[in-house]
């Protein structure tokens, strides 16, 4: 097919790790895959839609070169309504060649503003008096001294949730890869049903959304 939209509109929830508190005493680990609580919030650019997500955990771990204590607690956080868009392209016609992927994260300034809001919310929550009993010491202080340093922490601590979406965008216009029935435009009998058809990613993990879409589409095919 020759649709210019194939592989475009790539986006995901960028997961930022690195806001850690070290404690002298070991904190009991959670059996819930590390997360003991999830916090949702709204940034100043949210337009009323929740766009911040924090995972509070008792298993401190981050990406190098950020400091990770042996004992303590942390948040990993995300701005969940990203505006940056990347692309996924074929390297060549060899099906065994690795694709060319450009996530292009933080190319839209609002995404960094949202991530900064999530970090500030994390600092507000973990710095609250209710956490004093753990005797935690905030780590990575050199990355928290000013706005530029905090942006550096966000960039160095960024990875992905694995909620990649949008590269086979659904829409009513001819520029969309699939139509509202999930049929690929220009290809007879071909349908797509996964997160790639989502035009704009949901503010929550995509698992439930994709399951619901798949159940609905299965009844219509």
Question: Can you annotate each of these PLM segments?
Answer:
Residues 57-64, 70-135:
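C-terminal segments that line or cap access tunnels to active or ligand-binding sites in enzymes
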